[in-house]
Amino acid sequence: MTFNIIELENWDRKEYFEHYFNQQTTYSITKEIDITLFKDMIKKKGYEIYPSLIYAIMEVVNKNKVFRTGINSENKLGYWDKLNPLYTVFNKQTEKFTNIWTESDKNFISFYNNYKNDLLEYKDKEEMFPKKPIPENTIPISMIPWIDFSSFNLNIGNNSSFLLPIITIGKFYSENNKIYIPVALQLHHSVCDGYHASLFMNEFQDIIHRVDDWI
């Protein structure tokens, strides 16, 4: 997958990038997403919620270059043409999780089938990362389906160059005849500001509302 180099000296975000990268400023934001219509449609069609949410997340991420901006293995700043999800799968027997990645696809059915194939092959492997090699252009997505939360923060203390988003989903709950799910977004301030966090959440809510258009 193509990694497009950003020439820092000519980048219009240079001052912001250097300031927040040197400070190592990361932040998280959590929003309750209305999945009332989404959950009903997913159930009617016979699909699982988790991969359907992953698909919607990746549609937002791959639509916006800012969420694909990072530093590659050669320590170069740039952005990927496309990112793939690296998601957690829980093993009830071992009470541990596995991280599996699946190729992103704009077609929901294609992505869903690829997800199911990867899940079948790797979900029972007692390894943290059973599907190898893991491509550089992946972002972490996880779900904590046992609890809903109003905030969530995940820090990477030994990798100061990890700039890509980290997304965590919680347990859905009902309130006032609506169904909500908490979504936490962890961002590096060197590449993403509050505007971009809002952009992600608003576009994610929009694609969830428009489930009829893509499922």
UniProtKB/Swiss-Prot annotation:
GO terms for biological process: response to antibiotic. Disulfide bonds: none annotated. The active site is at H189 (proton acceptor). The keyword Acyltransferase applies. PROSITE patterns: CAT (PS00100). It is an enzyme of class 2 (transferase). It catalyses: chloramphenicol + acetyl-CoA = chloramphenicol 3-acetate + CoA. InterPro entries: CAT-like_dom_sf, Chloramphenicol_AcTrfase_AS, Cmp_AcTrfase. Keywords: Acyltransferase, Antibiotic resistance, Plasmid, Transferase. It holds the Pfam family CAT. GO terms for molecular function: chloramphenicol O-acetyltransferase activity. Its EC number is 2.3.1.28. This enzyme is an effector of chloramphenicol resistance in bacteria. PANTHER family: CHLORAMPHENICOL ACETYLTRANSFERASE, SLR0299 PROTEIN. Homotrimer. This is Chloramphenicol acetyltransferase.
